[in-house]
Each structure stands twice: as C-alpha cells, then as structure tokens.
Curated annotation (Swiss-Prot):
GO biological process, one term: protoporphyrinogen IX biosynthetic process from glutamate
Lineage summary: Bacteria, Bacillati, Actinomycetota, Actinomycetes, Mycobacteriales
Organism: Mycobacteroides abscessus (strain ATCC 19977 / DSM 44196 / CCUG 20993 / CIP 104536 / JCM 13569 / NCTC 13031 / TMC 1543 / L948)
Highest taxon in the source lineage: Bacteria
Site (Important for activity): H99
Note: During catalysis, the active site Cys acts as a nucleophile attacking the alpha-carbonyl group of tRNA-bound glutamate with the formation of a thioester intermediate between enzyme and glutamate, and the concomitant release of tRNA(Glu). The thioester intermediate is finally reduced by direct hydride transfer from NADPH, to form the product GSA.
Protein name according to UniProt: Glutamyl-tRNA reductase
Keyword set includes Transmembrane: no
Catalytic activity: (S)-4-amino-5-oxopentanoate + tRNA(Glu) + NADP(+) = L-glutamyl-tRNA(Glu) + NADPH + H(+)
Residues that bind substrate: T49, C50, N51, R52, S109, E114, Q115, Q116, Q120
C-alpha cells in the first residue's frame, strides 16, 4: 500500500476551476465516505483551502485508486474527467510525501511561508479521523507533516515578513483607501481566517468592526476579542449583513459557503451616497458576487488579484533552506516507513518461533512425564534463550537493510525462508494499527 495524492491548486488551475472543486466542511465527510466504499482505498484525507483541493489516500493499487478518487472529485465538481485532468496533478509514494511536507511548510502556498496552512492540515486530519478514515499511514504522515512545518518556520526566515493571504489582501485595501487607521471594517465569517483578519485589522488601527457570521455565538466571541483590544465591535448574523455593509469601508469575507453570500443588490443598496467600498474576498468559492466588481466605487480584491501581487512571493528567498529541511525530513520519514513495514514480518517470525518452542516443550512433557518442575523450567528458559539469540542478529539486520530504498525485498525473503503465513503477518500489522493521537495533531 502507498500514499496517492490527487489535487489541484493555484499553481495548476484558475480560480473559477478551483471554485468548482472546492470541498466545504459539510461535503468532506460525503467525499470521504464515498471514496472509502472502494476496496482499493483504505485511508483518505481531504485538504481543501482557499487555493487548493487535495485528496491524500492510501491505496492498494495506483491506477485503480486514482480512478476512484478522480471520479469522486469530478462528480462533486460537476466536471468530466477529461476536463478535470487538465488542471489536476498526481503524486505517488515518495512524491506524495514530499508534496504534503512542502504544503505544510508553506513552500507551495500562494504566499510563500504563510502559516495558516498548518492549521488547515491539522483540521483535514481531524475531519478524516472523526470519520474513521485514518489508519497508521495517514496518521504518521500527517503527524510528520505538522512537525516538519513547525520546524521550517522555527529554523528558517521563510515567514519573517509575516505574510499571509489576509495580510496581502489588507495591504491592497490599505492602498486603495489611503490607509486603514480610523476606518470601519466588517469581517464576514468567524472561522480561523476571520479571526486572523480581525487580528490584522486591529493592528492596522481600525476604529470600528462588524463581525458577521451565521452563528451569532461565534460572532459575539470574536467581537468580544476585538473590544478587549480597544475596538468598537458589534456582532450580527448574516441576516443583518446590510447593517455592516452600510457602515464599512473594507469588508473581509471568507465563509466557506458554496455560493456568494454578498449579492449585487446587497452592495448596491449599501453604496447609496457614493462612497468607496473595498471587498477582500478570500472565499473559495467566492463570497462576493463577481458582478459587484462592476459597481462604481467598489474594489474587489480576490484570490486572482492576490496571486498577481509580488508580495505573495517575497519570502521565496528563504525557500532554499526550507526545501533542504523538507528533503531531509522526507528521507527520514521514508526510512521510518520502510522499517515499520518490515516490523510485522519480524514480529510474526518471533511468534512462529515461540509457537515452535511451546510445541517442542509439550513433546518433552510427553516423553519425560516425570521431569521435575524446576528442571522443566530451566530447559524451557534455555531453549527460549537459544532461539532468541539465533533470531536476534538476523532480525536486527533485516530491519537495517529494509530501511534502505528497495529494502522491502528483505522482508519478503524473510517471509519466504521461514514460510510465514501472509495472513499472520497482516494480522500483526493490523493490530494496533493507529497509535494514540498525538499532541501535534490536536493542539
């Protein structure tokens, strides 16, 4: 079994295509469950952000697994497979590992070095785990990716500029409005991106903030945080969006909705009086109706505009050191995986040896029924010691050999030499399949 990645991002597809492909939180469980119906896929995780959609899966066969995943995504997006393949990319085995490590490190982001993707990877894992779609392989892969991402950010200067999609958008808004200090802002969506936007708007010096969200409670919590920072903040639901639009100079929106939440009529009504209004539309799909950009006095900063901004590539100078860390960590991960794959074979061999020892001791009992208990115990200990010593060197060596590229052949040779039952090896591998969730994945 190997890891297969099927995805599309800002590097391979235009925004209109990414909008079709976007998989919202509500749809992710459906996609996961549909893909897992195939016997060719044993684990699956969906990573969907404002500029990428990627499915990571553990598959029994490359071509079969690719067909299952591709068809599931195509059906979700309402696209034909021929159209989808124009924009999709595929990574397998080592290349899939390297890609996820690069993504978690911010190396593949629209804004190189941004850190929000770490939380997005963590959320993708949590969703997959909650739907029993994660086994040992994706657990270890996700844990390693998060650790690598943190290491890159702590050991390199890749995020020294503090850039993110939000900061790039707000810099553009600042330029359009001749400054954000003293302005009134609205944040539509109180999730992680909305929280980040709120924090950056506060640092930019806004005076007033409207927090708009479907859930009034989440909006109130975010507004309370802003008030603690000295900003006059109010929380409203989406039903009252018009109140915020009527007052705001800049609107930052990222709701995760499947269709626009800000319509042409909403904005047209809010613009009465001839004022200027800047929208930072960070949603994928878009939160702001595209026709809004044609209104006088309106500026829409969307993902396509952000992608063209030179600031989004400013951190690339530090990418070399980050890439070296990723390469080193990929090698480390693959070594660990190869050793993990041979471990069930070694364990099955030791179990087989223990069974042989016990069978021979039973034969001894039949031949020497009068053997004293203490003497029998000493014989048993001696036999077990001999077997352990005989097995120690070859099992240690096979783990070492298996850790090198192409080392799976040594485990196969061990199974053949000792006639180990494949079902026994598989049972050993399955037992304790998923370790306890780690702090990396849940903090």
């Amino acid at each position: 079994m190997s890891v297969l990645l099927f995805g599309a991002s800002h590097r391979s597809a235009p925004v209109p295509v990414l909008e079709k492909l976007a998989i919202g939180e509500a749809d992710q469980p459906k996609i996961i469950e549909h893909i897992l119906q195939s016997p060719l896929v044993t684990e699956v995780m969906v990573l969907s952000t404002c500029n990428r959609v990627e499915v990571y899966a553990v598959v029994e066969a490359f071509h079969g697994g690719l067909t299952v995943i591709g068809e599931a995504i195509a059906r979700h997006a309402g696209m034909g497979m021929n159209e989808l393949t124009k924009y999709a990319y595929v990574r397998y085995s080592e290349a899939a590992v390297e890609h996820l490590f690069a993504v978690a490190s911010g190396l593949d982001s629209m804004v190189v070095g941004e850190q929000q993707v770490l939380g997005q990877v963590r959320n993708a894992y949590a969703t997959a785990e909650s739907h029993q779609a994660v086994g040992r392989v994706l657990h270890e892969l996700s844990q390693s990716a998060l650790r690598v991402g943190k290491r890159v950010h702590s050991e390199t200067g890749i995020d020294a500029a503090g850039a993110s999609v939000v900061s790039v958008a707000l810099n553009l808004a600042d330029n359009k409005l001749d400054g954000l200090p003293g302005r009134t802002a609205a944040v539509v969506g109180a999730g992680s991106m909305g929280s980040l936007a709120t924090a950056q708007l506060i640092r930019a010096g806004i005076d007033n903030l409207w927090v708009v969200n479907r859930s009034a409670e989440r909006a109130r919590r975010l507004a309370a945080t802003a008030r603690e920072a000295g900003v006059n903040a109010q929380a409203i639901t989406l039903d009252n969006l018009d109140q915020a639009l009527a007052q705001a100079d800049v609107v930052v929106s990222c709701t995760g909705a499947v269709r626009p939440v800000i319509s042409l009529a909403d904005v047209h009504h809010a613009l009465e009086g001839g004022r200027q209004l800047v929208f930072c539309d960070l949603g994928m799909p878009r939160d702001v109706d595209p026709t809004v950009a044609g209104l006088p006095g309106v500026v829409v900063v969307d993902m396509e505009r952000i992608q063209r901004e030179p600031t989004a590539r400013a951190a690339a100078n530090d990418a070399g050191a980050a890439r070296q860390i990723v390469n080193d960590e990929v090698a480390r991960y693959l070594t660990g995986e190869r050793m993990a794959e041979v471990t069930p074979t070694v364990t099955a061999l030791r179990q087989r040896a223990a069974e042989v020892v016990e069978a021979e001791l039973l034969r001894l009992d039949g031949r020497l029924p009068g053997l004293a208990g203490a003497e029998r115990d000493e014989v048993a200990k001696t036999v077990r010691r001999v077997v352990d010593k005989l097995l120690h060197a070859p099992t240690v060596r096979v783990k070492q050999l298996a850790s090198a590229p192409g080392g799976d052949s040594y485990a196969e040779a061990l199974r053949e030499l000792f006639e180990l039952d494949p079902h026994t090896v598989e049972a050993v591998a399955t037992a304790g399949e998923l370790p306890l969730a780690t702090k990396e994945l849940h903090e």
